[in-house]
Amino acid sequence: MATVIDGKNVAASVIQTVKSATAALEKASGVTTGLAVIIVGDDPASHAYVGSKSRMAKECGFKSVQHTLPAETTQEELAGLVATLNADPSIHGILVQLPLPKPLDSEPIIQSILPEKDVDGLSVVNAGKLATGDLKTGLVSCTPAGAMVFVRRTHGEDLSGLNAVVIGRSNLFGKPMAQLLLNANATVTIAHSRTKNLAEVCRNADILVAAVGRPEMVKADWVKPGATVIDVGINRVPAPEKGEGKTRLVGDVAFREVSEIASTITPVPGGVGPMTIAMLMANTVIAAHRAAGQTPPQF
């Protein structure tokens, strides 16, 4: 039976490090870590996400600022707010909650955030820094950064000699995840919907990361015995056993059967999910340390 990684536990330990680093920075240089969150419109799911991010920022000891804008906000108004926050030295991280209501275009807004304040790790500058192996000045997208914490805690810092397969090639997750694994010396294959003999490719992986959004696609016979399996999928499927019209969350991995083969596995829910918000806090305190000329904490 595989060891099941408790994402909530690992996230809590990351948050503990963030709290200590926040307090130490304030003591050493008088700098309070500042996070600004921008939300446009009244989408309930977006407001729930923003609420949890703001609460966590306060819990970490950050100065947390939330800008709630009406749905009819123009592109120019939103760009103006980002420019103001870029120029504010008390703000170290800027987060724009996506998706933005139509007709707003999120891409130019995201790219206008200063790379050193881009705590979501979505700017092309930060993507480029990751691609060139610059983890000293870049910020990494939160979900792959969180998944990588699991990998490091299982295998250590150096993945030399290990084969890693990432299923999924999205800019948000697949590409940065592959890059992080490569930077740690793994031999990396990126697989996707056009990959031939996908099961065979996966069976070669010592570290298998699934991020395609297809419920329970990865079966036991896709997995090398003793592999580490990281499941990033979040899929809602019907759960008639819970009652009519009810659903449950599953990942991209058939958890029960793969648990019999893998040595380590992440569950859904409760695996990678809790790490995303923890790494957002980690990125923010890293950005604050850099701005203050201090050595940032390691996660």
From Swiss-Prot:
Name the HAMAP family for this protein: THF_DHG_CYH
Instruction: State which pathway it belongs to.
Output: One-carbon metabolism; tetrahydrofolate interconversion
Q: Which InterPro entries match?
A: Aminoacid_DH-like_N_sf, NAD(P)-bd_dom_sf, THF_DH/CycHdrlase, THF_DH/CycHdrlase_cat_dom, THF_DH/CycHdrlase_CS, THF_DH/CycHdrlase_NAD-bd_dom
Q: What is this protein called?
A: Bifunctional protein FolD 1
Which residues are listed for NADP(+) binding in this entry? G168, R169, S170, S193, I234
GTP-binding: is it a keyword of this entry?
no
Q: Which UniProt keywords are listed? A: Amino-acid biosynthesis, Histidine biosynthesis, Hydrolase, Methionine biosynthesis, Multifunctional enzyme, NADP, One-carbon metabolism, Oxidoreductase, Purine biosynthesis
E.C. number:
1.5.1.5, 3.5.4.9
Q: Which GO terms describe its molecular function?
A: methenyltetrahydrofolate cyclohydrolase activity; methylenetetrahydrofolate dehydrogenase (NADP+) activity
Q: Which reaction does it catalyse?
A: (6R)-5,10-methylene-5,6,7,8-tetrahydrofolate + NADP(+) = (6R)-5,10-methenyltetrahydrofolate + NADPH; (6R)-5,10-methenyltetrahydrofolate + H2O = (6R)-10-formyltetrahydrofolate + H(+)
Look up keyword Amino-acid biosynthesis and say if it applies. Answer: yes
- Recorded family membership: Belongs to the tetrahydrofolate dehydrogenase/cyclohydrolase family.
Which species is the source of this protein? Answer: Rhizobium etli (strain ATCC 51251 / DSM 11541 / JCM 21823 / NBRC 15573 / CFN 42)
Q: Which GO terms describe its cellular component?
A: cytosol
The UniProt subunit note reads as follows:
Homodimer.
Q: What does this protein do?
A: Catalyzes the oxidation of 5,10-methylenetetrahydrofolate to 5,10-methenyltetrahydrofolate and then the hydrolysis of 5,10-methenyltetrahydrofolate to 10-formyltetrahydrofolate.
> For this chain's UniProt record, which GO biological process terms are given?
L-histidine biosynthetic process; methionine biosynthetic process; purine nucleotide biosynthetic process; tetrahydrofolate interconversion
